[in-house]
Amino acid sequence: MIKERVKMEVIGLEIPLISGNEDYTLAELISTYPLEDKDVIVIAETVVSKIEKNVILKNEITPSNEAMELSKKLGKEPEVVQVILDESNEIVKLGPNFIITETKHGFVCANSGVDESNTSKGIKPLPKNPDKSAEEIRMGIEKITGKKVGVIINDSMGRPFRKGSCGIAIGVSGVCGLWDRKGEKDLFGRELKTTEVGIADELAATASAVMGQSNEGIPLVIIRNAPVPFTNGTGKELIRKKEEDVFR
C-alpha cells in the first residue's frame, strides 16, 4: 500500500534583471512575494554578487606576469585569469584549458567560481562572504514579513569523478547546512554511525534544476515544506577540511 509521506513544493520566480544600481535590497524584493513560515529561499549567487556590486570591470584589472603566462595555457583573457588568481588561496590542479583552485572561501572548483555569464559587463567573482550575505537577507525578510524562513545562496559547480555541473550551497542561514544524523536508528533499529547529510546542497541542487543554467531567467526559488531542520546552519560547515581530504 503506497502512503504519501512528504509533499514538497518548488516554486521558480522571475525577478527584474539586477544591474547593481537598485534602490532596494534583495530582502525587500523577495518580501514582495507571499512567503510562508519555514519557506526555504534559494538565491543564485549571480544575483547576490551583482546587487552587492561585486563585479569587476576589465579596464580596472592589471594582469600580473603569472596571469599573462597562465592565460596562454588556459585560453582565457589575462584579466579573467588575474581575477581567478586574486580569488584563490591556491591552485589545486592546472591543465590545458582548465584551472582548479581553492577559493578564499575554501571551495575547490574551476576558475575560483569566477565567470562572465549572465553579466552584461565585467567579471563576476563569488560573493565575498556568502554566509553573511545569506544571514543579512534572511534577517531582512523576517523583519519585513514576520515569517521564519531559511536562505540558501547556490552556485553550480562541477564534481570530481562525475560529469555535469550541479547546484551546491555556498551560503546558508536559518536552516541546517550539514545534518548530523549519527545516533539515529535506521528502519531496522540499527544505530547510524557515520551518516551526515549535506541537506543544504540537496536543496540547492533541487532549486538549480528549476533555475536552469542558461537563459531561463529564474534566479530565485522558494522550496515549501522542505524536510530540513531550521537551525543556525552555515555553508562553511559543508567544506571538508584539507587535512580530511583524501584526494589532496
Curated annotation (Swiss-Prot):
Cofactor annotation: Mg(2+); Mn(2+); K(+)
Enzyme class: ligase
Residues binding GTP, per UniProt: 15-18, 45-46, 50, 118, 211-218
Binding site for a divalent metal cation 2: S156, Q213
GO biological process: F420-0 metabolic process
Pfam families: F420_ligase
Keywords: GTP-binding, Ligase, Magnesium, Manganese, Metal-binding, Nucleotide-binding, Potassium
UniProt binding sites for a divalent metal cation 1: D115, D155
Superkingdom assignment: Archaea
Reaction equation(s) it catalyzes: oxidized coenzyme F420-0 + GTP + L-glutamate = oxidized coenzyme F420-1 + GDP + phosphate + H(+); oxidized coenzyme F420-1 + GTP + L-glutamate = oxidized coenzyme F420-2 + GDP + phosphate + H(+)
GO MF term set: coenzyme F420-0:L-glutamate ligase activity; coenzyme F420-1:gamma-L-glutamate ligase activity; GTP binding; metal ion binding
Cofactor stoichiometry and binding remark: Binds 2 divalent metal cations per subunit. The ions could be magnesium and/or manganese. Monovalent cation. The ion could be potassium.
E.C. numbers: 6.3.2.31, 6.3.2.34
Gene3D superfamilies: CofE-like, CofE-like domain
Pathway(s) annotated for this protein in UniProt: Cofactor biosynthesis; coenzyme F420 biosynthesis
Subunit structure of this chain's protein: Homodimer.
Protein name per the record: Coenzyme F420:L-glutamate ligase
Organism: Methanococcus maripaludis (strain DSM 14266 / JCM 13030 / NBRC 101832 / S2 / LL)
